[in-house]
Amino acid sequence: MTRTSIALLAILPGVFPCRAADGSRIDLAKGWWIQSSAKVAEKGDAISGGKYAPSGWYPAAVPTTVVAALVQNKMYPDPYFGMNLRSIPGTTYGIGTNFANLPMPADSPFAVSWWYRTAFQLPTSVKGKRLWLNFDAINYRANIWLNGRQVAKSDEAVGMYRMFEFDMTDIALPGAANTLAVEVIPPTQTDLTITYVDWNPMPPDKDMGLVRDVYIRVSGPVSLRNTQAVTRLENHGELAHVTLYADLKNTAASAVEGTLKAAFDNVAVSKKVRLEANQSTRIAMPAQDVAYPKLWWPYGLGAQDLHHLRMEFETGGAVSDREELDFGMREFASEVDAEGHRLFTLNGKKILIRGGGWSSDMMLRYDDEREENEIRYARDMHLNTIRLEGKMMNQHFFDTTDRYGMLVMPGWCCCSYWERWRNWKPDDYRIAGESLRDQIRRLRNHASVFVFLYGSDNSPNAEAEKVYLKVLEEEHWLNPYVSSAAKATTPGAGPTGVKMTGPYEYVAPNYWLLDRTRGGAFGFNTETSPGPAIPVLQSLEEMLPKEHLWPIDEFWNFHAGGGGYRNVNVFTAALEGRYGKAADLNDYLRKSQAMTYEGERAMFEAFGRNKYAATGVVQWMLNNAWPSIIWHLYDWYLRPGGGYFGTKKANEPVHVQYSYDDRSVAVVNSYYRGFSGYKVAAKVYNLDLTEKFSKTATVDIGEDSVVRVFEIPEMEGLSTTYFVRLTLQDSAGKPVTSNFYWLSTQPDVSDWAAGNGRYTPIKTYADLTGLEKLAPVKVKATSRAEQKGGEEVQQVTVQNTGSALAFMVHLTVRKGPDGADINPVYWEDNYFELMPGEKREVTATYQRKLLSGAKPQVKVDGWNVQ
């Protein structure tokens, strides 16, 4: 079932009927009301009483933050448009500052606690059962009341990344109305809460609220929790040892004897257990050997086989409690090589990490369909990893990454109280440790989760690291762990083997292969990028008022980042220096898409060519928390830009590429199988498309390898702006891929001495202004649709009918000839070139429902397309 926290229910106060969908869980998502404690005189015992009648409260659905619920109730204008966010009371912190590190303004409506209240009726079938009230995340503290009695106090229910469960059996009323009231206390600058660092602004409530699911679990006298499947492989994956764990708790006043049973695939195992009165214990089941197991692999490297595990405790001839989950048989490991670089392996195979940093929605609204679309976008770009810096996401996210074969590297966030260990009090260490424990318990069974970073920009102090490592050991975390996203060494974990040396602003495409000291293509760069990513016009029109679309002004800057990234000045200077000064908004946008295409392609290509001297790179970022002009591969409205398709091109599994450092042509194979008899061809063209060089070669490509085929020589008589076109065919002559570069005889020259962790300035720009002289051309497009379930696939044929190059040809699918574009659309290719007369076929896949009944229309535009 898809739940979106912004889908609030406008219903009258009353009792919401509840039932357990599977006999063991009752969701409390609907029928909530919220109000500021400043407007409520009563205390928790009265508010959670059945006679209390809320007046003037706001309807809500959980999970939701306070601000998200108020926005849904139209109390404030869309905070994501223009500078509307600044109009919400309490948003007085300096633009570009990290609000998480500042106190809440005293006059902010969110400086006080807010009440969440719901009334629900429990089914009579739960009578005689144990009832457990669960909160999967509360930001940040809470006093919890049920039916007039306090279930938990704020010193107990505390911690954004904690998961809480309370025995409500003696308070609940089966077959009758129940009232739950939660007083949520906002986080302060000295709490272990969520932060968006310099990525984007923060809502004025600091995301306070019930921000994950609230539900009731039903069990017999013995509850079963924290089921875990641990897999170890032998003989190159031909044998898997699977060990199962579960936590049992006897709530009865006397001893209970029973049987713990587990089953997956064709394996069944059981164990007799005796639990004394009120005893809690962890049970390890006998290890099971599985011969020739179906292993889990990332997408493109093998199947995403998952195994369904059912665990239950039976006593007195009845099932007291059960849990079910899917797990993957796979084994991750890592090592720090002789150069100090961390290299990850999966099932005994090396893997180059190609990833992007993820952000949750700024108001922590969750949408299952959107999540799946975004993960599919990542996979479509041939990325294999998503990094979560403090944005742990919900269960659906991890279930989806398991199914899609997308690796996940979660960890804590930087630049907040999480890294101010010198100020931590004893309770902070407790909260941090229990936060890690709860997150590890929910992450460890997911095949896609392969590492945990218990530090971000910095490694924790010795005391915090001891707390973290103790938790990882106790919870059977067998995946790798790293103490920081930056280069560091700690007593408990040794060297991190990674770097966090930038850049984050625009750098020249040749930077990645020429740099030897900072962010270049060596080692594992945990967060880096070629800087801003300007959205296309349609997105800018949705995020900015018309009068602020051009020129770039404070509205643009508000949708940039914070700290040192509050504008796009570095990017714009490079754009004008390389492509020529923008004549207007459309000119700026076409040049932006070209520059982000070549920038992202260059970064990923460099790490691909240099594997395994380069062991990983994480693009900062994959997506944004709100509409932004920096750090994404597709924008808030799910429109992919030039950076998306540059990334997709660079990371294709078998890829031919040009090297900016030595002019070599290389083939990069990411498959765990080789290919023979492949034909590589390279052509060099002047701006007017006169051919200046041509060469072909036949190569054999080993599994997961790189072959440098030949070099393109320096040559005389080139136009200042010129082109290189590469093609790759298989042994039967079938096209595998192609690649197209626009280059200059005047290369970019970086000012290495002035470089820093933010960026390395360019002192001489490549001259690509010749592109402005490309003659206008017409590109003809025809398409035919094919239905595949709920999806439609457009087979699009485009042809350049002009006599000049068609540059950066861009396709969109629209709702009829004059309708809006639809997104997400998964294009086989986009922002490509067409030679005069050239014809190309590409596919576009999308959900048919996005058309809203209209007839799809493929629209063509481009750099010089009429």
Where is each model-derived feature located?
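Accessory carbohydrate-binding/adhesion or oligomerization-edge regions at the termini
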Residues: 20-97, 179, 183-189, 327, ...
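Substrate-binding clefts and catalytic carboxylate motifs of secreted carbohydrate-active enzymes
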Residues: 26-27, 33-42, 61-67, 111, ...
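Accessory beta-strand-rich segments of carbohydrate-active enzymes
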Residues: 33-39, 69, 79, 83-86, ...
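Beta-strand-rich binding/interaction modules
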Residues: 144-146, 239-275, 281-284, 663-700, ...
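Extended acidic/polar, glycine-enriched regions
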Residues: 173-177, 245-336
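Terminal connector regions
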Residues: 293-323, 713-765, 823, 845-866
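N-terminal carbohydrate-binding accessory modules
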Residues: 312-378
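Substrate-binding/catalytic cleft of secreted carbohydrate-active enzymes
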Residues: 385-563, 595, 599, 614, ...
